[in-house]
Amino acid sequence: MFITFEGSEGGGKTSQLAALANYLRQQGIPVVATREPGGTPIGDQIRTVILNLENTAMQPRTEILLLQASRAQLVEQLIRPRLAAGEVVLCDRYADSSLAYQGYGYQQFPLEELKALIGFATGGLKPDLTLLLDVDVEEGLKRRAQGGGWNRLDAYDQAFYQRVRQGYLEMAQAEPGRWVVIDTGRPFELVQAEIRGVVFERLLNR
């Protein structure tokens, strides 16, 4: 089963994914946790280029293509083989991040063009379940500021992240069979409990 975690800044994707992965392992369920961009040696090198604060001259089109290159490597080297082996794959961001950030956020590229490019990079591989960890933009940015570790993709204004959040919500509404929206404006434990419930229901019914 292929499960992706999506959301704007400060939603807690990374920590919630790690907690879920640990819990699944405790239950004896084979699981691999990965992330985008990165997740493979080649992808991690691409990630470094994308996030480097010194690369201020990087154009949006360049960024999109680098993200798809990292994604293509991750799908073929890790995700498909692990799924074929019967493992649960948890991914911190995937194709929907490109649509939310480079599509809805930048507002420079037609969504259909991005979808075609993503389809080529992934070979059409879509998640079985996408968890949208949703948080109010202002609250999310406060959490992000407290976390530190800034990178090039953090240098956007609040209006940009509002568009990203709206894009995520529109995608979730358009494909309710795949998406589940999780309100992360609550204590960590409550959010994790809801995530576990959703995931186990899908695992039992697959």
What are these regions (language model features)?
Residues I3-F5:
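Hydrophobic anchor at the beta1->P-loop junction of P-loop NTPases
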Residues G10:
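Walker A (P-loop) phosphate-binding loop of P-loop NTPases
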Residues Q16:
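Hydrophobic positions on the alpha1 helix immediately C-terminal to the Walker A/P-loop
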Residues A19-A21, E138-R206:
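NTP-dependent small-molecule kinase module
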Residues D96-Q166:
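A glycine- and Lys/Arg-enriched "phosphate-lid" helix/loop adjacent to the NTP-binding pocket
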